[in-house]
């Protein structure tokens, strides 16, 4: 898989209509009957970055595992990213957070485009997912306060149907606990679900090797 060919294919995929909600629902069918009232909820704005880079003659991207803490996304697998700060664009947020969390030099990051926004009800965030690339393999440096570990994923693994699995998950909410059968992506033996999985599924659909 030639790196430049993949990057070109990603650029070309952004010239077509995004798969959007249809791709999201494949990995989050429980969202189908949920109507999100953004005006009423006034969500916080966040950005993430799916960052492609060359490694060992292959194409990789990285995910991170959040540390354990008293919060909604404790121990979850996600992209580098975070809350939009006053005075910066959502694209700048994605680049800044990637630098702060995994140490990638902002100057080296090339943004290709933005995928479909994803609303996350438990934390009331509206996520703007960006795709970007590096010319060279990065030397990561994780911020231990925000990143438990960095997970490097070969892009070829993303396009195997065998990675789509499901498991029962129990959720704790103010209205009470409930259990759902939740689809997830099995990447590097990690359970990748929720907003991260729906963003990745849209990316899968955009490329479809």
Segments predicted by a language model, with ranges:
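Alpha-helix initiation/capping motif
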Residues: 1-2, 20, 140-143, 160
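N-terminal leader/linker segments that precede catalytic domains of diphosphate-processing enzymes
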Residues: 1-76, 83-100, 104-112, 118-128, ...
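Non-catalytic surface loops within mature trypsin-like serine protease
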Residues: 55, 134-136, 155-157
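Short, glycine/charged-enriched secondary-structure capping and boundary segments
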Residues: 77-78, 125-127, 145, 166
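Short helix-to-loop capping/linker segments positioned immediately adjacent to catalytic or ligand/cofactor-binding
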Residues: 115-119, 137-142
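NUDIX/MutT-family hydrolases
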Residues: 142-182, 186-188
């Amino acid at each position: 898989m030639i790196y430049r060919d993949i990057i070109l294919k990603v650029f070309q995929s952004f010239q077509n209509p995004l798969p959007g909600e249809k791709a999201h629902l494949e990995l989050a069918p429980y969202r189908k009957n949920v109507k999100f009232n953004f005006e009423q909820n006034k969500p916080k704005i966040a950005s993430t970055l799916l960052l492609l880079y060359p490694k060992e003659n292959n194409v990789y991207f990285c995910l991170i595992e959040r540390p354990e803490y008293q919060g909604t996304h404790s121990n979850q697998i996600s992209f580098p990213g975070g809350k939009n700060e006053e005075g910066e664009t959502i694209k700048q947020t994605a680049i800044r957070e990637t630098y702060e969390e995994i140490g990638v030099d902002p100057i080296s990051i090339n943004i290709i485009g933005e995928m479909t926004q994803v609303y996350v009800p438990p934390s009331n965030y509206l996520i703007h997912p960006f795709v970007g690339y590096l010319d060279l393999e990065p030397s990561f440096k994780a911020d231990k306060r925000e990143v438990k570990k960095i997970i490097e994923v070969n892009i070829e693994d993303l396009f195997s149907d065998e990675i789509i699995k499901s498991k029962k998950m129990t959720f704790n909410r103010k209205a009470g606990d409930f259990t759902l059968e939740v689809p997830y992506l099995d990447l590097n033996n990690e359970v990748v679900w929720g907003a991260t999985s729906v963003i990745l599924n849209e990316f899968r659909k955009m490329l479809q090797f």
